[in-house]
Amino acid sequence: MESTKKQVSLELLPWLVVHTDGTVERLAGTEVCPPGLDPITGVFSKDIIIEPKTGLSARIYRPFSIQPGQKIPLMLYFHGGAFLISSTSFPSYHTSLNKIVNQANVIAVSVNYRLAPEHPLPTAYEDSWTALKNIQAINEPWINDYADLDSLFLVGDSAGANISHHLAFRAKQSDQTLKIKGIGMIHPYFWGTQPIGAEIKDEARKQMVDGWWEFVCPSEKGSDDPWINPFADGSPDLGGLGCERVMITVAEKDILNERGKMYYERLVKSEWKGKVEIMETKEKDHVFHIFEPDCDEAMEMVRCLALFINQVEA
């Protein structure tokens, strides 16, 4: 009797496997939870459609404490997952957004961009750009009634931080009347062919991350593609970053740690006229705040992000 078990064509661990018939089986980030009232923070959320043609959706959040007529900052959030996994309804992200919205007192729009390999890059960037440029046109009451569009922030973790970086450039170069107040980049997913920092000693992990990127964005440039390496040939000069303020957070044990620090250093030395700050969390690894939301370090990071958005010195 012939086995009905699917044969594996490609393993991209720990995220997914691709079977010989072309189907993609994700191994992480597939759990979902509904929107609604969060009993712990009092934050309300609901799912909305941004672009009916593509099915692009988002989960929007508003704090409990908001008053009629009150205007508060608007935060577009982009989740991580190496452009391969996760969603706005992934329980850990939903919990994280509830905490950020409660602490920072913002209207948040968590963008559910489409994932590779079914939707190869630059689809994630295009979806995120669609969400940003159409944020007013969708005619969402929570945005119309409560969001201060002059206080617009782009925030993301890992791949989502990478997206925030690119959107800040695109918004400045476009003819859209978009003014981004600041971007928050949590453990940004930047990479490069030449290893630096911990990448030099941890060859196995370096090769693994190389493989992730080559899978979602196959090109002759590899990890020196401007999408992933902001300092590679063809990347826009950081002096042209289209926002007033930047906050970068890195984690000591994260393989991406040195990339985030390098971004900070290069931005400081550039012609950019804004204000940048960096925060390093000791003894923690990549996106720890998503998987340990109640640890002291995660709560401190959320507190500092809230201060950044509300222009208060930590």
Curated annotation (Swiss-Prot):
SUPFAM superfamilies, per the entry: alpha/beta-Hydrolases
GO molecular function, a single term: carboxylesterase activity
Chain's role: Carboxylesterase acting on esters with varying acyl chain length.
Name of the molecule in the record: Probable carboxylesterase 2
Keyword Repeat: no
Keywords annotated in UniProt: Hydrolase, Serine esterase
InterPro entries, A to Z: AB_hydrolase_3, AB_hydrolase_fold, Carboxylest/Gibb_receptor, Lipase_GDXG_HIS_AS
Active site per the UniProt annotation: 158, 254, 286
Motif position, Involved in the stabilization of the negatively charged intermediate by the formation of the oxyanion hole: 79-81
Reactions mediated catalytically: a carboxylic ester + H2O = an alcohol + a carboxylate + H(+)
Expression by tissue: Expressed in roots and flowers.
Domain of life according to the entry: Eukaryota
Protein's gene: CXE2
Family to which this protein belongs: Belongs to the 'GDXG' lipolytic enzyme family.
EC number(s) from the headed UniProt entry: 3.1.1.1
